[in-house]
Swiss-Prot record:
GO terms for cellular component: cytoplasm. It is found in: Cytoplasm. Pathway: Amino-acid biosynthesis; L-proline biosynthesis; L-glutamate 5-semialdehyde from L-glutamate: step 2/2. One of its GO terms (molecular function) is NADP binding. This is Gamma-glutamyl phosphate reductase. Belongs to the gamma-glutamyl phosphate reductase family. Keywords: Amino-acid biosynthesis, Cytoplasm, NADP, Oxidoreductase, Proline biosynthesis.
């Protein structure tokens, strides 16, 4: 417990120094991190292999092992994402608005760092870098608590980043890692309102709900992705096939992959066998509603639990719907408010879907796989918020700041 508090104290104190640094000083620190990661790619891969071996011994699924995996390509993608963040404008110090009052004072809002951010995440060691670079560029200290399944990877990456910071203006203590695998440490961390300004959980819906239930620290809810694609009766079949396959099988273990497919009843008999054949070429297990089972007789019956489930695997549940209204109603009942898509040629139906579906990202004729900080031009993201207050959708630099009022006067007093 003392060790935890000591780490949090260091992060808090360092956050004040970081908040004073200019953009060039912060960018130099990010560049140093990128260079040091590149120098140590082999070392990171070696530690990552330990996590993968341990995961295989534990019987982790292929989807989870894929989330843990760091190969040279993924590490070079991480390095590129750091370069992308360096190029982004720094929101800190930006005056959001300024107005002159009748008495002559100027009243405005300035963007400032949140302070100390704790991120609690499951088996994704790339988050260790993404969270750190975004936090540092936006002037925040970061406390990292990753999954024990990627512990070796997270530790070596953090050591490499802190080593890089030791030769920059950014204090290495602005980056802290909680190495203990004990769940009780997470509960302790989430009570530390004197040191942590906000907590961001990333993981399954069950995990995120648990964090929100036990935390005294303010929490930004991030997204599990029980995502849907709805195929309207006027949809272009070739477009629909391409989008569905990309959204389901390109990388099924990530939160912007789809888990459910809704199909208008008027095209179900023609389209279902086509898309089922496509999905089965990738060994996707198909579950379906009663109407789906009449067309795909070898599909597995979908249960009520299926409609709520984020599989993160080669599994999809299919439902035939009467109309766009039923599709929207179904999505809003079962989704996790992450990413939803419609495939249609009808402008008005597309507009209705955009307006009525409750999600952080809503698509027309495109794959949900684009819900990502890099794809949205944010460089990277610390998480994808599925709540409606403070931030919604991929959280980049601006979302890791808050505002304070700044008032400029020339001796005015209130009469």
């Amino acid at each position: 417990m003392e060790n935890l508090i000591e780490k949090l104290k260091k992060a808090k104190v360092s956050s004040y120094t970081l908040a004073l640094l200019n953009t060039n000083e912060k960018n130099e620190a990010l560049r140093a991190i990128a260079n040091n990661i590149e120098k140590n790619i082999d070392k990171i891969i070696k530690e990552n292999e330990k996590d993968l071996k341990r995961g295989e011994e534990k019987g982790l699924s292929k989807a989870v092992l894929d989330r843990i995996l760091l190969n040279e390509k993924r590490l070079r993608d991480i390095i590129k994402s750091i370069d992308d963040v360096i190029k982004l404008p720094d929101p800190v110090g930006e005056i959001v608005s300024m107005q002159k009052r009748p008495n002559g004072i100027l009243v405005g809002q300035m963007r400032v760092p949140i302070g100390v951010i704790a991120i609690i995440y499951e088996a994704r060691p790339n988050v260790t870098v993404d969270a750190t670079i975004l936090a540092l560029k936006s002037g925040n200290a970061i406390v990292l608590r990753g999954s024990s399944d990627a512990l070796n990877s997270n530790i070596i990456i953090t050591e490499i980043m802190k080593e890089a910071l030791s030769n920059t203006k950014v204090p290495p203590d602005t980056v802290q890692i909680i190495e203990s695998p004990e769940h009780s440490v997470v509960e302790e961390l989430l009570q530390m309102v004197d040191y942590i300004d906000v907590a961001i959980p990333r993981g399954s819906a069950k995990f995120i709900k648990h964090v929100m239930n036990i935390s005294k620290v303010p929490v930004i809810e991030t997204g599990a992705g029980n995502n849907h694609i709805y195929v309207e009766e006027d949809a272009d079949f070739e477009m629909a096939r391409k989008i569905i396959i990309n959204a389901k099988v390109q990388r099924p273990s990530v939160c912007n992959a789809i888990e459910k497919l809704l199909i208008h009843k008027n095209i179900a008999e023609e389209f279902l066998p086509i898309i089922a054949k496509d999905l089965r070429e990738y060994n996707v297990e198909i579950r379906g509603c009663k109407r789906t089972l009449k067309i795909l007789t070898d599909a597995i019956p979908a249960t009520e639990e299926d409609w709520y489930t984020e599989y993160l695997d080669y599994i999809i549940a299919i439902k035939i719907v009467e109309s766009i209204d039923e599709a929207i109603e179904h999505i809003n009942k079962y989704n996790t408010k992450h990413s939803e898509a419609i495939i249609t040629k009808d402008y008005y139906k597309a507009l209705k879907f955009l307006r009525m579906v409750d999600a952080a990202a809503v698509y027309v004729n495109a794959s949900t796989r684009f819900t990502d900080g890099g794809e949205f031009g944010l460089g990277a993201e610390i998480g994808i918020s599925t709540q409606k207050l403070h931030a919604r959708g991929p959280m980049g630099l601006k979302e890791l700041t808050t505002t304070k009022y700044v008032i400029l006067g020339e001796g005015q007093i209130r009469e």
